[in-house]
Amino acid sequence: MAEPVLTIHGVTKHFGAVKALRDVDFTLERGEVHALCGENGAGKSTLMNIIAGVLQPTEGEIRVDGKAVRISSPAAAQYLGIGLVHQEIALCPDATVAENMFMAATNRRRAPLMNYRRLERDAQAVMNRLAAIDVRRRVADLPISSQQLVEIAKALTLDCRVLILDEPTAALTETEAQQLFSIIRDLKANGISIIYISHRMAEIFSLCDRVTVFRDGRYVCTDRLADLTPDDVVRRMVGREITQLYPDKLGADERSGGIILEVDGISDGARFHDVTFGLRKGEILGIGGLIGSGRTEIAEGICGLRPRTAGTVRLHGAAQPIRAYSDAVKAGIVYLSEDRKGSGIFLEMSIAQNISVLDLKALTNAVGLLNGRAEAALADDFARRLAVRMSGIEAPVKSLSGGNQQKVAIAKQLAVKPKVILMDEPTRGIDVGAKAEIHRVLRELASAGIGIIVISSEMPELLGLSDRLLVVREGRIAGELSADEMSEEAVIRLASGMGSARAADHAA
């Protein structure tokens, strides 16, 4: 019997007093797609960073083709044929797509001169397998979904024997995801071994052969997916039953709350046009649509992050002169970006500093000195409410898992006691247990009278969480769906231009 391509035995990793991994095992066979599952903070990303040479284990052994190895750096991992596609974007924004794709490959091959024409030709050939993206474009000019495809294409240039994909479809459209799945199946057929990290059970059961589950930094089990159901995997991940992923929606008698936010005919002259809708007090209003439809741009236009050429935003009936995000925060409107590391959090700063950063004025005394005790109390309160897994509020945010970083980003917005919260992909890349916690928090905030707008590309989240749903198509409101009218088919028809609903003028 052939040796596994990768064997992990007894690996432990400490970050100070925090034990991120405790004596874990993992085996990857040749030509298999192996799912790695667990809640955020379970240790998945830590192990993948060890395999990819980003981190060094405190204890344990790694074998490649049966031989013990020390993977001391990402370059050493690449030499062994191991590639990692991070969940978070790690590209050079001012370089072109082609330059980003071949940066690691050219470093590895050490060519004395760069043939840019050949580089662009080879890069375009790889990129065409995923999407029609011009590799001469600057990465900073691409949307997040296209940047994620560049990350994947970059890994495909390395001729990997082991490819690690960490939430690769989190920012992709359905069409883009299907193209990626086709490539994964081709790679598998050619003997490439793939570690697939995802919280999307449908993807795992469609693509993967086996699943390994981690919980609280420990190895739980490895099973053939053919022998399991999605509920089996979830139970192994969380160690408990998830009884209700989505809290109860508003009852019919609760849906008549007064309008708290009015968006009247706003346009930016390019990405969204004549957008009109209302948000009721205590309501969770979902906004759906295809990636690139203008959902994010509408939210940015409301809160001063994107200039508007027309229209008015009113809060409690009063027009708000919002020209910058600071104006929106002062008025009581906050926005959680879909790009949490680019716009949502400060990785090098502490958890306490991140949570308090939007309202430092309230935490300073008459002479402008920060009240550290008040800051700590504020941060500790919100970190506990959102169940942030941490060693302490003074820990840097970069030490947290992706899901816990997202919780800190949400806590930062909540700390200013907003009247309206706009959340763009609030649970992207977060495990099922953390999703349930965040959904519970959102419903509690709505019950306290806050108006909440949720933009999501996850259909179950839109349908399960929203009291009312707007669908955006080509920068315009294509229609509105009440709780009773919501269905996946109805959303898809509106998003693709195949159906109609009540006019946007009646969206409130």
UniProtKB/Swiss-Prot annotation:
It comes from Rhizobium etli (strain ATCC 51251 / DSM 11541 / JCM 21823 / NBRC 15573 / CFN 42). Keywords: ATP-binding, Cell inner membrane, Cell membrane, Membrane, Nucleotide-binding, Plasmid, Repeat, Sugar transport, Translocase, Transport. It is an enzyme of class 7 (translocase). Disulfide bonds: none annotated. The keyword tRNA processing does not apply. PANTHER family: CARBOHYDRATE TRANSPORT ATP-BINDING PROTEIN MG119-RELATED, GALACTOFURANOSE TRANSPORTER ATP-BINDING PROTEIN YTFR. Its EC number is 7.5.2.7. Part of the ABC transporter complex RbsABC involved in ribose import. Responsible for energy coupling to the transport system. ATP binds at residues 38-45. PROSITE patterns: ABC_TRANSPORTER_1, ABC_TRANSPORTER_2, RBSA. CDD domains: ABC_Carb_Monos_I (cd03216), ABC_Carb_Monos_II (cd03215). SMART domains: AAA (SM00382). SUPFAM superfamilies: P-loop containing nucleoside triphosphate hydrolases. This is Ribose import ATP-binding protein RbsA 2. It is found in: Cell inner membrane. Belongs to the ABC transporter superfamily. Ribose importer (TC 3.A.1.2.1) family. Residues 6-241, 254-499 form the ABC transporter domain. GO terms for molecular function: ABC-type D-ribose transporter activity; ATP binding; ATP hydrolysis activity. Its main location: membrane.
